[in-house]
Amino acid sequence: MVLSKTASKSDDSIHSTFASRYVRNSISRFEIPKNSIPKEAAYQIINDELKFDGNPRLNLASFVTTWMEPECDKLMMESINKNNVEMDQYPVTTDLQNRCVNMIARLFNAPLGDGEAAIGVGTVGSSEAVMLAGLAFKRQWQNKRKALGLPYDRPNIVTGANIQVCLEKFARYFEVELKEVKLREGYYVMDPDKAVEMVDENTICVVAILGSTLTGEFEDVKLLNDLLVEKNKKTGWDTPIHVDAASGGFIAPFLYPDLEWDFRLPLVKSINVSGHKYGLVYAGIGWVVWRTKTDLPDELIFHINYLGADQPTFTLNFSKGSSQVIAQYYQLIRLGFEGYRNVMDNCRENMMVLRQGLEKTGRFNIVSKENGVPLVAFSLKDSSRHNEFEVAEMLRRFGWIVPAYTMPADAQHVTVLRVVIREDFSRTLAERLVADFEKVLHELDTLPARVHAKMASGKVNGVKKTPEETQREVTAYWKKFVDTKTDKNGVPLVASITNQ
């Protein structure tokens, strides 16, 4: 590569990036360097470091889209310099966002008349969308309590222990008590009966998850709605439901159209969905839509005019790129209902291929269900010598990024591996992954147990540990061990399960 800067007497080799002073010396890490460098050198230095990142296509921990068509890539690059918040300057982009909101609201069966505009907003992801929905519920609850002359300083929200961290953030940041329904082995989603039991007069809403991060399972929103209807009748309360459909919102309408989880249920007042997951758009784009205009309090909507015109806004952030909004509209009109259904069908079929391949090894228990988000969550049948964290670590050698994690309370003694099936995960990749799992298991069989042999026979005060105690101890050890393991570039060897 030839550098753009003319060579000087002090550096005759400046014409070659790899022979120049720019790669002979360490690049600045903590302070802005005093001098400029040629653009080719800057590109090459950064590009070389980025090679140590994992391959996004082989990152099976993530639900986030990692491939789009070249035509959509082109549209995104052509609009990358547009600030989405500047509605007056970019009216067409604003119109495209409104079209997306209307399409998604109708996809979720919002009670809208012909030509009636839906109520919703684009966000940077489902985390922001969940927080906006939560703020609307909190303000609605406060307004009702104030009107009745009742205390409004102790709001709570009910959900399962399988929630995404964004809901925990909402509760902590906006001072709302989080009431979690504990999980149990074999049942890794919120139990609607237990959730409704936890509802009281201070509950601003119950959050149901359509597509658990842990297992991909859809929670029973219809049963939750029916139970809440009965409780509301008995108590005189009006406890509503929010559906976190970050993963499942672009799956259920196409694969399970008869499943009632959305605005067909009267207590569902708002729904969020991630466009950058099964909406098939690169990160980060999310959406939140409300059932009716009255479900979003007017006082939460701000009006600004310093960008040239009066603009309503209800977001936690302000400036953001418009590329993802444009890409979402591209996917909606490019694929249509037929295209989305075909993509989701293919994901489900590839999930079944992987699931059956893992079952045939005879080494795994499948934890996830066949219906739901197309993923496979599974655990070792025999973890007496080696566990899931070791399997995940060794898969890295083949390029695969597969997360291993423990379940939340009260199922934290259960450890699983999880593979998310995205649009770009082919049948061939599924078959190769199964083969690589078998190679890893064969190699582990030839190795001595690194931890279990020492801990399995352990005793506490002369009393032998139960299998559950041993498993918890081993899992905690391995989680701590793997969390501290990094490659030579400081990158963790095992991906976390966070994905918004």
Swiss-Prot record:
The keyword Lyase applies. Pfam families: Pyridoxal_deC. Gene3D superfamilies: 3.90.1150.160, 4.10.280.50, Type I PLP-dependent aspartate aminotransferase-like (Major domain). The modification Phosphoserine is found at residue 8. It is an enzyme of class 4 (lyase). Keywords: Calmodulin-binding, Decarboxylase, Lyase, Phosphoprotein, Pyridoxal phosphate. The modification N6-(pyridoxal phosphate)lysine is found at residue 277. Its EC number is 4.1.1.15. It catalyses: L-glutamate + H(+) = 4-aminobutanoate + CO2. It comes from the Eukaryota. The keyword Lyase applies. PANTHER family: GLUTAMATE DECARBOXYLASE, GLUTAMATE DECARBOXYLASE 3-RELATED. Belongs to the group II decarboxylase family. This is Glutamate decarboxylase 3. It comes from Arabidopsis thaliana. The gene is GAD3.
